[in-house]
């Protein structure tokens, strides 16, 4: 299949587009023009590649998780180690690319939204590197959950604005950042952290994150002597690490692609962020995509143990993959993610982010189904340092509840 998305209007099949007020249209058109110019300029990519090598530490390893594979007794599991990037997650791939683009556009200030804080830290890091002013918008609820990342951002010279609107999480931070961009368009670039928002953001983020899949494809060949893995697994919130892994394989039809959504307390409760499992198409933050909404089209609150996955929408390209059945999207509960978190830590000595733990949990199930002749690549999108205290508290609370139940 020849995959040519997006079209000139920013649509991936029937999803995507540019649903923004007139005040923002100038900015997104300016951004698209600058991005097309950078794509045509070899020096832009050369400079970015050099930074990715020398500053970020790419390429990241593709690691055969032998212990985990043997423990499960199924398909071979290879981990794409995005947790080993500078700042501890895949987010830096996009942040660095966009700050470099903004610098070339002559912008002076950077703004961004963040949920778990990883995109905020990555953006603040890139802004420090390029000596640019930086403000990060973060839902008040996430500020509490991720105090360590808030301090990191401030340490890197960024100003962190706690957003008190709505449910005080990621979608509210995006709203606040977009409002700020409208008011400061001339000298400010807004760095969206995931593969969503109005065109050209989903395409830009995908392109900067596709380094994950391009490296993994070549590394898999070098490691195994085989052409392609049988499956890919990555967690999806907005979906940037997943689209980065999936996109370079999209025309390889023999490769099954699985995105793991946050099922929270279960998809039959109101407490989840399983957008493709339970949502339907709607416009959010400038793009037509699958969205969690009620019968009246009001956006529902998303819920997940992982701050990076509780977004009520998903990038339009994922909605398109789902629509054309190129990828499958499966719900993984908080409890399953916690099991994945502990299992990888115990068996491989790698503490994954709670986001990535959703992918690990599903990979364990999939490995059993596929059997030992098959193999898969799992995107380990980030490291779990930021989540250790939260997991400790949660496991202690669960143990106390069990103790009370047995008393």
Curated annotation (Swiss-Prot):
SUPFAM superfamilies: Tryptophan synthase beta subunit-like PLP-dependent enzymes. InterPro entries: Trp_synth_b_CS (IPR006653), Trp_synth_beta (IPR006654), Trp_synth_beta/beta-like (IPR023026), TrpB-like_PALP (IPR001926), TrpB-like_PALP_sf (IPR036052). One of its GO terms (molecular function) is tryptophan synthase activity. Keywords: Amino-acid biosynthesis, Aromatic amino acid biosynthesis, Lyase, Pyridoxal phosphate, Tryptophan biosynthesis. It catalyses: (1S,2R)-1-C-(indol-3-yl)glycerol 3-phosphate + L-serine = D-glyceraldehyde 3-phosphate + L-tryptophan + H2O. Coiled coil: none annotated. Its EC number is 4.2.1.20. Its cofactor is pyridoxal 5'-phosphate. Belongs to the TrpB family. Tetramer of two alpha and two beta chains. This is Tryptophan synthase beta chain.
